[in-house]
A protein has these predicted regions:
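Catalytic centers of hydrolytic enzymes
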Residues: 1-240
Length: 240
């Protein structure tokens, strides 16, 4: 029930982003990651979420009255199309990883922006510590999962920890996981798995079904999650 001209949220400050000059300091990139993380957790358990700079396409500015319409917000993450339904927007997917593989992903994503600024990551649901003085691809030494409200819990990064943790991203970014070994020259490996720990070769099998109680696959879209997240913000100035 989203109409292009429907007001969703108001802001009195800029939410800034520029892939080349303002990606590290951006307050919009983390918002996109937070939105996806919240959206998926409404229907599925999700441990942490990844969004990347290269798929953010517009900033959010207050304009004359601060109102942000559906079409304003859609322009932030408008790219892609469905895997099966061919509707607008990249679909969200969920992959399961071991703690050691999470470390490998973090190591790879610290390297990835050096290959392309579009690879700069924005995370939600995860905190990590690294030492830049350590050798490349072995700098992450602590990872915690959680959220600011309930706190973060450190996880065991050793290979003896066989627990699986869920990561959500869109289907485009998910393809990168198959390239981790290539990007790291074979030093790091990640084996995408389903929730049962079975290795997955067709990454399309990891697309999230937003309404599993219905027949078929109802793809969850990145842009829809962004808008739904903002739409649940309270009206603080009483002009709803």
């Amino acid at each position: 029930n989203l109409e292009a001209g429907k007001p969703i949220v108001e802001t009195d400050f800029d939410l800034r982003f520029n892939e080349q000059t303002y990606r590290v300091e951006s307050n919009l990139g983390p918002l996109v990651a937070d939105a996806i993380h919240w959206y998926v957790n409404q229907t599925h358990h999700n441990d942490f979420t990844l969004a990347v700079a290269g798929l953010i396409r517009d900033e959010i500015k207050p304009g004359t009255n601060g109102e942000q319409l559906v079409n304003d917000l859609y322009r932030v993450v408008p790219l892609g199309s469905g895997v099966f339904d061919n509707s607008a927007g990249y679909s969200l997917a969920q992959v399961y990883l071991t703690a050691a593989e999470i470390k490998n992903v973090l190591e790879a994503m610290m390297l990835a922006p050096k290959l392309s600024t579009g690879n700069y990551p924005y995370w939600a649901g995860i905190q990590y510590k690294y030492n830049p003085r350590r050798i490349l691809l072995d700098q992450v030494y602590e990872v915690s999962l959680g959220d600011p409200v309930n706190g973060y819990k450190r996880i065991d990064l050793s290979k003896k920890n066989e627990n699986l943790y869920s990561l959500t991203t869109n289907n485009y970014v998910l393809e990168f996981f198959g390239l981790v070994q290539e990007v790291t020259f074979g030093l790091l490996k990640v084996s995408p798995k389903d929730r049962y720990g079975n290795p997955v070769t067709d990454l399309n099998d990891l697309i999230i079904d937003g309404k599993p109680e219905q027949a078929g696959l109802q793809e969850m879209k990145e842009w829809e999650g962004f808008i739904q997240y903002l739409s649940q913000f309270p009206d603080v100035n009483g002009n709803e």
